[in-house]
């Protein structure tokens, strides 16, 4: 039996990759394919670009089928450990990361001059979905690479040249936002940032909680830089480099699911850092951009989990016999599977429609940093920015709920066996539960999405 390939096994992915909107996306992202003279691997034209996305997706599908999926159970049981203020990943997690780095699947959306693949967000999001279908916890660690988008958008040239190549080479990232008293209400962040005149740098002091991959190489940190402020306008965003030291992991949380992903409590002791972008725009501008990327990521993770739940339910229903026939032949079971598939397909369609909107507006944003946009381009940019801003919370909210529903139904199809720990459906159920909570609860996504309707 050949190993599963998490890309080629799902024909819907190729269907979404070949959406007509991709032509405009590639044209913008590749600036009319101008890189072809500078880089060997750069595409010559649209067909060439799609072909390269297809190949990378196939490699991702293969690594996922042959390494990440078989490791998922062991990682779920072992989990990461905390020793001397550092995180030690589960052994399977290390294997997964090594495989992804060796295949060059890091900094996927970054320009080629930094060692990136210059992929649009859509094929990158497909990779995130594929990885999450095998191990949602590992999906978190790997897909946090998209924090680099925010550094690319708002950091300066010097920061670009120092940090982006490191992420493209496989270093990991985290976004340090949440605190014990600042969960959904991020304007209450208290982590203190003070300017150190003597050493010409900023210093961070305080605590962050629930930080995914909290011992990452590079952190984007939301902190209070303005003395005496209490609201979001006193917050700025900082880049902390683990090489400088000063941030330790006090503990790793013991969670219901996504065990492979270390969720950390961090202590900052005079940690050296640097400002990203302008002061006072940390929450209102930069974290909003960061969160939109993260929400798209969680939507992809949710679709991956929906797919995994459906796969497990379908396989079991075909295999399990009662009353002399496979249970899939009973209308009640068949009906459940049909509804699961409908939620999966609808959610995936919403996800990639959203990612395409994001792609067009982000590419135009990037072009605007190089030259003045034409009036037509400005119109296009505004149109897609608005669509992306309303669709992103919609995709995250709907897909996270669908993932939970599909995981629940997958266990139901398994009957008593679904309640036993040796079947994968219980891990999928536990992993799915966080998707409707983190990066903004479903209730908050509703508020964010409805703003554009009313």
Where are these regions (language model features)?
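Amphipathic, small/basic residue-rich leader segments at the start of a protein or domain
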Residues: 1-138, 158, 162, 366-375
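Alpha-helix capping/hinge segments and adjacent helical runs
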Residues: 4-15, 19-26, 258, 379-454
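A glycine-rich, basic-preceded beta-loop-alpha segment at the flavin cofactor/substrate interface
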Residues: 38-41, 243-246, 250, 262-294, ...
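Flexible, glycine/threonine-enriched loop-and-boundary segments that flank and lead into catalytic domains
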Residues: 83-110, 174-203, 207-218, 385-401, ...
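Glycine/proline-enriched, intrinsically flexible loops and inter-domain linkers
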Residues: 114-145, 153-186, 209, 235-237
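Internal maturation/activation junctions in enzymes
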Residues: 143-144, 155-191, 200, 355, ...
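A short core secondary-structure module
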Residues: 201, 205-247
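Extended amphipathic alpha-helical segments enriched in small hydrophobics
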Residues: 295-376
């Amino acid at each position: 039996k050949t190993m599963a390939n998490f890309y080629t096994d799902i024909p819907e992915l190729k269907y979404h990759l070949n959406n007509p909107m991709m032509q405009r996306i590639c044209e913008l992202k590749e600036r009319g394919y101008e890189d072809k003279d500078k880089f060997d691997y750069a595409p010559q034209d649209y067909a060439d670009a799609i072909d390269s996305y297809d190949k990378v997706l196939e490699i991702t599908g293969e690594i996922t089928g042959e390494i990440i999926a078989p490791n998922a159970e062991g990682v779920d049981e072992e989990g990461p450990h905390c020793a001397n203020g550092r995180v030690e990943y589960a052994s399977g997690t290390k294997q997964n990361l090594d495989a992804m780095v060796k295949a060059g699947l890091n900094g996927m959306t970054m320009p080629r001059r930094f060692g990136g693949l210059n992929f649009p967000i859509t094929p990158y999001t497909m990779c995130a979905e594929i990885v999450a279908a095998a191990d949602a916890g590992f999906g978190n660690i790997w897909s946090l690479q998209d924090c680099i988008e925010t550094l690319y958008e708002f950091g300066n040239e010097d920061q670009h040249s120092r940090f982006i190549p490191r992420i493209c080479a496989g270093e990991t990232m985290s976004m340090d936002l949440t605190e014990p008293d600042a969960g959904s209400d991020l304007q209450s962040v208290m982590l203190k940032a003070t300017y150190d005149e003597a050493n010409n740098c900023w210093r961070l002091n305080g605590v962050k909680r629930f930080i995914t991959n909290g011992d990452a190489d590079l952190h984007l940190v939301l902190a209070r830089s303005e003395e005496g402020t209490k609201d979001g306008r006193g917050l700025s965003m900082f880049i902390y480099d683990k090489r400088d030291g000063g941030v330790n992991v006090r503990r790793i949380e013991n969670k219901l699911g996504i065990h492979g992903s270390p969720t950390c409590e961090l202590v900052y002791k005079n940690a050296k850092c640097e400002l990203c972008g302008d002061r006072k725009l940390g929450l209102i501008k930069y974290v909003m951009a960061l969160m939109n990327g993260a929400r798209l990521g969680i939507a992809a993770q949710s679709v991956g989990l929906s797919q995994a739940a459906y796969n497990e339910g379908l396989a079991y229903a075909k295999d399990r016999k009662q009353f002399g026939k496979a249970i899939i032949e009973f209308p009640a079971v068949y009906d459940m599977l049909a509804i699961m598939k409908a939620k999966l397909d609808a959610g995936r369609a919403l996800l990639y429609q959203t990612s395409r909107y994001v792609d067009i507006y982000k590419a135009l944003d990037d072009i605007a940093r190089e030259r003045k946009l034409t009036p037509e381009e400005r119109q296009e940019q505004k149109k897609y920015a608005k669509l992306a801003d309303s669709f992103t919370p919609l995709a995250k909210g709907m897909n996270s709920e669908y993932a939970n529903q599909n995981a629940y139904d997958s266990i139901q199809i398994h009957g008593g066996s679904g309640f036993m720990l040796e079947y994968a459906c219980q891990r999928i159920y536990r992993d799915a539960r966080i998707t409707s909570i983190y990066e903004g609860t479903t209730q908050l996504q509703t508020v964010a999405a409805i703003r554009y309707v009313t």
